[in-house]
Amino acid sequence: MFFWYQNHVIAKLLVWLLFPFSLVFWFISVIRRRLFRLNWLKSYRSPVPVLIVGNLSVGGNGKTPVTIWLVKQFQSRGIKVGVISRGYGSRAEYYPYLVKIDDNPTISGDEPLLIAQRTGVPVCISPNRQQAIELLLAQFNCDLIISDDGLQHYKLQRDFEIVVIDGERVFGNGFVMPAGPLRELPNRLAEVDLIINNGKLTGYSNTLMLLLPKFAVNLVSGEKKLLRDFQRIPLNAIAGIGYPQRFFNMLRDFALTLEKTQSFQDHQDFDAVHFSYFSSNQPLFMTEKDAVKCRPFAQANWWYVPVEADIQGEEVERFMQVVSQQIKEKK
């Protein structure tokens, strides 16, 4: 919500109006987690290690690029990975559902489809994470399960936890939902194995992730062009991600001229009507996550910008070694 990251009078008023509800949310969350830790509520232990990639706050913090980066890193170490996701926005006829790389994103969800296309590993979506893991292990020889999101899904026991923090917005006003963006308070960070800062260091760790664009890809032809090839052309841009401004800022950092921009809600289900606002004579840029949903009605001058995560820091290398060693020992 807009007021989570603002400091004007109306934002403060909304915070205090919603604060009693935040107290209730926080209390229920604390009690619920305590019941899981005491085994009063049942949880599932996977026969292979589980790594959770999550966050403390609502909205796009960069979990999916981290998941893709992790999969590729473990693949380079000879570790077979399976990915599970709740599949937010998916409308599969049944669950658990194994994502196919040519799926319609309305069936699989945009992020699971993107992970499957970028990595080639098996991806299974289901609100029931246990069923997703069991299906993956029944059909694939996985050494490691990575859960894209699910830090607060305590029905699933985990061996490792990664939290991704938005380096620009961090934790907003610092309140838990609905007065603020937090699902859990920052003291939860003391319990996780690795903290990754997206874009800027925050003081919570020295591990930094940069999302590096290399080129633009045409949605119709597949042609690739360097971003600098568009520097003298007025462009339009859309983004249906958790923090659209990050995408627009990235394009401007490459000296691209954005004439019109349009932000959509995260996981927006696009159709051609959403783009009637833009001139068909100008290039339209979008994220790769948005592109998987726009291909059926894409025009000849629509482009998406894939990014590669570059994660730096001694902590991440130590983390990778610890996880790899545990997997080898379990084998």
From Swiss-Prot:
Gene Ontology terms for molecular function: ATP binding; tetraacyldisaccharide 4'-kinase activity
Domain of life: Bacteria
Role, per record: Transfers the gamma-phosphate of ATP to the 4'-position of a tetraacyldisaccharide 1-phosphate intermediate (termed DS-1-P) to form tetraacyldisaccharide 1,4'-bis-phosphate (lipid IVA).
Keywords: ATP-binding, Kinase, Lipid A biosynthesis, Lipid biosynthesis, Lipid metabolism, Nucleotide-binding, Transferase
Pfam families named among the record's database cross-references: LpxK
Any coiled-coil regions, as ranges: none
Keyword Lipid metabolism assigned: yes
Annotated residues for binding of ATP: 57-64
EC number: 2.7.1.130
Protein name per Swiss-Prot or TrEMBL: Tetraacyldisaccharide 4'-kinase
GO cellular component: plasma membrane
Family the entry assigns: Belongs to the LpxK family.
Organism: Histophilus somni (strain 2336)
